[in-house]
Swiss-Prot record:
Region (Hexokinase large subdomain 1): 221-460
GO molecular function, one term: fructokinase activity
Location of the region described as Hexokinase large subdomain 2 in the Swiss-Prot/TrEMBL record: 663-902
Pfam families: Hexokinase_1, Hexokinase_2
Protein name: Hexokinase-3
Chain positions recorded as ATP 2 binding sites: 542-547, 687, 754-755, 791-795, 870-874
Catalyzed reactions: a D-hexose + ATP = a D-hexose 6-phosphate + ADP + H(+); D-fructose + ATP = D-fructose 6-phosphate + ADP + H(+); D-glucose + ATP = D-glucose 6-phosphate + ADP + H(+)
EC class of the enzyme, as a word: transferase
Residue span of region Hexokinase small subdomain 1: 84-220
Source organism of this protein record: Rattus norvegicus
Record: residues binding D-glucose 6-phosphate 1: 95-104, 222, 245, 426-428
Domain notes: The N- and C-terminal halves of this hexokinase contain a hexokinase domain. The catalytic activity is associated with the C-terminus while regulatory function is associated with the N-terminus.
Source domain of life: Eukaryota
């Protein structure tokens, strides 16, 4: 496009060489005008291509790819949360660079309520030219003096005033309060500032001033301020969009996707810096000759090409270039371009906005053009208005394509079928232009139909928005401190775990010697573990709840085959007479034998009986009390093996050889011991927790004999009932204990097992909610409900992908409304509770394996532990944490953990077979 030189006339003057008014337009002029306007038409395909290209560039930048170099920067702003309406307090804002040669100081009061949520007062200070061009220290000292002067006018307490700094110059931000100036713009040329942390320079100046105690909390750009400053609605505002002199957007990205952060959890606000976007294949086809001319005339040709098609600084200039071209071709103004029209930047954004107004636009066209020394005809005014519409429509559509890329990014990264989000809008193009937002909305709906978007005008992003960033940062810091203080008692040191290990060793020794101890150390009369030679067919019974299992276990060389049948125990049987219960059990056994073709055979039988018993022999167990909803009369205080044998006798013609009554923990050890002869410990971590191990018989005071081994049922859930664990207990443990059916008992179990961990978490969440840290401080009935937070939720939450989707789903199903910060904190609470549980369990295992090693006088011990229980098996980190703790506390022991397969069935059968083997050996 040919360069156009101004003729040197003043605005308002007309060139005397211009053709006379009223001369008709040359033929074909309307077609020529249409041709020029057509250049600004952007097709849906082109918009989709721009959307895809920008999205690709965004993702490249997020990943830190530099080849090919992405055309957008995707800068982390270190703003990690959006407002949730409870922010309150007084905040200072210093705004420098947003309004040219002046700075603004604001006092913003946030009330934390929906009504009158924000109150502000402000003062503007003109920056002298010698300060703008002087030393950097002089500028920041001036800013500090302005802060003091502003505060002097109001009665404020000089106690840690929180300040947000809006510094509108290109910076490299490395933290919320760390930002290095890249280069000055907007006429500022202060020496000694470029390459320096401007937040620190401001802090130093405030300290030199020495008048007020001001804490600079956050450095914020105007786009982020726009997002943070919008009114709270029914959906989260997680996108900020500025179309002012320039254009930019920011949004809340998953932190794990931002390579520059190297973080896994939470979100961070990313400033896209999309004004620099350029892709020849996508953007090239929509660039016009007028865009090229504008770029050539700009201060930095070739840069910010996308911004130069959208930003308010350029829209008026694009309109001017089109009008000049049309006039030079005789289409407008009788072929006459006035000197003012030929002058760069003579048409501004405010002119374009007024001329395009549907109601008063034509009148404004005449006013603006006459001010440029032109005398437009009616047809000229109409065409000028069409030019304005074409330029601005394209700008809105291009902006929409970029916004659609951001929305698509949000939707796909969060794996949401429909994204519901609010976009905060700010800038004079939105404020002044009547149609820009309408076109933007319509185009976004076409380009991102899967996104449900509401647009909310931001109120004073540079002031209120910066204050809100500061308030949110202060809130997060306070909440983080409270969370850490709350969870600190759950962070067990190596010294604490070593103490637990030592206390358990002492309790084990006292229990074995028959002295007073919280560990009962019960002999199980299982004297050996499998040696791999076990063969044969066995029956096993498993009674531990409302379902009862009968199993046929076939042990062959290298394999164990299990066939089982589940039978229900009706409530009237479970709570009727003992005779009726055991008759029902025998009926089930007989039915199973018929189904398996075993009628008339007398197979050795092992009985897993998961109720509290005092065992007097391998086949003698006195029921202490019923649990789990059973209350059959005439059983407590009786030998349950005897009751079973009596039921068999009553049935007649049934031959069953009851060899052993088996505890489920022992069954777990024996089940794993068949595959690994080194397995000498059993561990259950499920609804409850317990452990057993092979002790030297000489150490068991209650059983005569000096040689051989005896499996000891530790009943370690009661460890600490003597008060030895009181130093580890928290107020949350105390609340759970007091609400339990057995206050003061099973203290170790209540800190470890699945029955209680969810309740501990629930009490912590209640506490944090009461302090306003979680769920906006809003207490809900669901959190007040006992056992509403299932322990399985811990496994699901801690198994969650990095997006914390499972956390949100679980809590929302419970009726809780939460933010991403809430989800992250709930995850941390779950991790703290389950980590402590695993570490305590590990300390217990370490005590046992060290006891085995010292019993045998070994320098090094290699031993395996058979493990069962839903918490151990299903929790994603529990088993690893147990193993790590054991390695730290028992470094001389090499411990392998084996997950048991059907300890109640296979284990009971193996106990039975080992007992038979030992009996046969004794006979020989």
């Amino acid at each position: 496009m040919a360069a156009i030189e101004p003729s040197g006339l003043h605005p308002g003057e007309r060139d005397s060489s211009c053709p006379q008014e009223g001369i008709p337009r040359p033929s074909g002029s309307l077609e020529l005008a249409q041709e020029y306007l057509q250049q600004f038409k952007v097709t849906m395909t082109q918009l989709q291509q721009i959307q895809a290209s920008l999205l690709c560039s965004m993702e490249q930048a997020l990943k830190g790819q530099d080849s090919p170099a992405p055309s957008v920067r995707m800068l982390p702003t270190y703003v990690r949360s959006t407002p949730h309406g409870t922010e309150q307090g007084d905040f200072l804002v210093l705004e420098l660079g947003a309004t040219g040669a002046s700075l603004r100081v604001l006092w913003v009061t946030l009330t934390g309520t929906k009504e009158h949520s924000v109150e502000t007062r402000s003062q503007e200070f003109v920056i002298p030219q010698e300060v703008i061009l002087g030393a950097g220290q002089q500028l920041f000292d001036f800013a500090a003096r302005c802060l003091s002067e502003f505060l002097d006018a109001y009665p404020v307490e000089n106690q840690g005033l929180k300040l947000g700094f809006n510094f509108s110059f290109p910076c490299h931000q490395t933290g919320l309060d760390k930002s290095t100036l890249i280069s000055w713009t907007k006429g500022f040329r202060c020496s000694g500032v470029e390459g320096q942390d401007v937040v620190q320079l401001l802090r130093d100046a405030i300290q030199r001033q020495g008048t007020y105690n001001i804490d600079v909390v956050a450095m914020v750009n105007d786009t982020v301020g726009t997002m943070m400053g919008c009114e709270l609605g029914t959906r989260p505002c997680e996108v900020g969009l500025i179309v002012d002199t320039g254009t930019n957007a920011c949004y809340m990205e998953e932190a794990r996707h931002v390579a520059a952060l190297d973080e896994d959890r939470g979100r961070t606000c990313v400033s896209i810096e999309w004004g620099s976007f350029y892709d020849e294949e996508a953007l090239g086809p929509v660039l016009t000759t007028f865009d090229d001319a504008l770029d050539h005339e700009s201060l930095v040709p070739g840069a910010q090409r996308f911004e130069k098609m959208i930003g308010g600084l350029y829209l008026g200039e694009l309109v001017r270039l089109v009008l000049v071209h049309l006039s030079q071709h005789g289409v407008l103004f009788g072929g006459c371009a006035s000197p003012a029209l030929l002058s760069q930047n003579s048409i501004l954004l405010e002119h374009v906005a007024k001329m395009e107004d549907p109601a008063t636009g034509i009148a404004h066209v005449h006013t603006v053009l006459q001010g440029l020394g032109l005398s437009p005809q009616a047809s000229d005014a109409e065409l000028v208005q069409r030019v304005c519409m074409a330029v601005c429509t394209r700008a809105a559509q291009l902006c929409a394509s970029a916004l659609a890329a951001v929305l698509s990014r949000l939707q796909h990264s969060r794996e949401q079928q429909t994204l519901h989000v609010a976009v905060a809008t700010g800038g004079r193009v939105f404020e002044w232009h009547p149609r820009f937002l309408c076109i933007l909305k319509e185009t976004v709906m076409l380009l991102a139909p899967e996104c449900d978007v509401s647009f909310i005008p931001s109120v004073d992003g540079g002031g209120r928005g910066v204050a809100m960033v500061t308030a949110v940062a202060a809130r997060l810091a306070t909440h983080r401190r409270i969370l850490e203080e709350t969870l600190a008692p759950f962070q067990l040191s190596l010294e604490q775990l070593t103490a637990v290990q030592a206390q358990m060793r002492e309790a084990m020794i006292r229990g074995l010697q028959g002295e007073s101890s919280s560990l009962r150390m019960l002999p199980t009369y299982v004297r050996a573990t499998p040696d791999g030679s076990e063969r044969g067919d066995f029956l096993a019974l498993d009674l531990g709840g409302t379902n009862f299992r009968v199993l046929l276990v076939r042990v062959a060389e290298g394999s164990v085959q299990i066939t089982n049948q589940v039978y229900s125990i009706p409530e009237y049987v479970a709570q009727g007479s003992g005779q009726k219960l055991f008759d029902h059990i025998v009926d089930c056994i007989v039915d199973f034998q018929k189904r398996q073709g075993l009628s008339g055979q007398s197979l050795p039988l092992g009985f897993t009986f998961s109720f509290p018993c005092k065992q007097l022999g391998l086949d003698q167990g006195i029921l202490l009390n019923w649990t789990k909803g059973f209350n059959a009369s005439g059983c407590e205080g009786q030998d349950v093996v005897y009751l079973l044998r009596e039921a068999i006798r009553r049935r007649q013609a049934v031959e069953l050889n009851v060899v052993a009554i088996v505890n489920d923990t022992v069954g777990t050890m024996m089940s794993c011991g068949y595959d690994d002869p080194c397995c000498e410990m059993g561990l259950i971590v499920g609804t409850g927790t317990n452990a057993c191990y092979m002790e030297e018989l000489r150490n068991v005071a209650s059983v005569p004999g000096d040689s051989g081994h005896m499996c000891i049922n530790m009943e370690w859930g009661a460890f600490g009932d003597d008060g030895s664990l009181s130093m580890l207990g928290t107020c949350f443990d105390a609340s759970v204990d007091q609400a339990s059916i057995n206050p003061g008992k099973q203290r170790f179990e209540k800190m470890i097992s699945g029955m209680y961990l969810g309740e501990i978490v629930r009490h912590i969440l209640l506490h944090l909610t009461s302090l306003g840290v979680l769920f906006r401080g809003q207490k809900t009935q669901c959190l007040q409900t006992r056992d509403i937070f299932k322990t399985k939720f811990l496994s699901e939450i801690e198994s969650d992908s990095l997006a914390l989707r499972q956390v949100r789903a679980i809590l929302e199903d419970l009726g809780l409304t939460l933010t991403s910060d809430d989800a992250l904190m709930v995850l941390e609470v779950c991790q703290a509770v389950s980590r402590r549980a695993a570490q305590l369990c590990g300390a217990g295992v370490a005590a046992v394996v060290e006891k085995i090693r010292e019993n045998r006088g070994l320098q090094e011990l290699t031993v395996s532990v058979g493990v069962d229980g839903t918490l151990y098996k299903l929790h994603p980190h529990f088993s690893r944490l147990v193993s790590v703790t054991v390695r730290k506390l028992a470094p001389q022991c090499t411990v392998t953990f084996l997950q048991s397969e059907d300890g109640s069935g296979k284990g009971a059968a193996l106990v039975t077979r080992v007992a038979c083997r030992l009996t046969q050996m004794a006979c020989v």
